[in-house]
Amino acid sequence: MFGNKIKKLILGYRASSDVYINFLRKQGIEIGNNVRIYRPFNTTIDFQNPHLLTIGNDVQITGPVTILTHDYSWSVLKKKYGYIYGNQRKTEIGNNVFIGWGATILGGSHVGNNVIIGANAVVSGIVEDNSVYAGNPAKKIMSLADFKAKREKRQLSEAKAYVREYKLRFGVIPPESKLTEYFFLFKKNDDVKTFHEMLTLM
């Protein structure tokens, strides 16, 4: 408890995911349920224009992520030409979205539902539903269904590699509790009590 108070004193509204999200909601940003910010202390979510940002349900924000609703590059135009060309646009993030490490969501972006944004992607414009995007600028690299098929195909070989490397490092076969991402390979759907936490992460 004391440690949490010190952490909040030092980091302020970025002390934890819940503290950050509550702060953003108080500013007026619309944020759904089951949203998680994994590294709140170095994730930047623009609250200058809270009415221009909406984040849906079941959104996983890794770190350090940046989500914007504005662009200050007009300062160069102002210096050169003496005019201000404002650039404040609505940014929307849908439901069931994963935003990878180091990604940037630029102002005016619309991220659909059931979307994976790859690490260090720079998103601008429309991101289609049920898709995986990556790169700078971010582009669609596959559908979510194709990504599922790709991951499904690799599950057994990756699980075997995990077990092999664990045994090489520690000299023993890993316990079931270590195989949190592969339990569907050896557990029936009605026998997953040990892995209940993994099934209820969001």
What are these regions (language model features)?
Residues 1-28, 33-34, 138-202:
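Terminal amphipathic alpha-helical/low-complexity segments used for targeting or macromolecular assembly
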Residues 22, 29, 36-110, 137, ...:
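Flexible, glycine/small-residue-enriched loop-and-beta-strand segment within the central core
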Residues 34-35, 127:
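Short loop/turn and capping residues at structural boundaries
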Residues 47, 82-85, 120, 157, ...:
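Short amphipathic alpha-helical patches
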Residues 101-116, 121-125:
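Beta-rich strand-turn-strand
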Residues 129, 134:
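Catalytic binding pocket for nucleotide-activated donors in carbohydrate/polymer assembly enzymes
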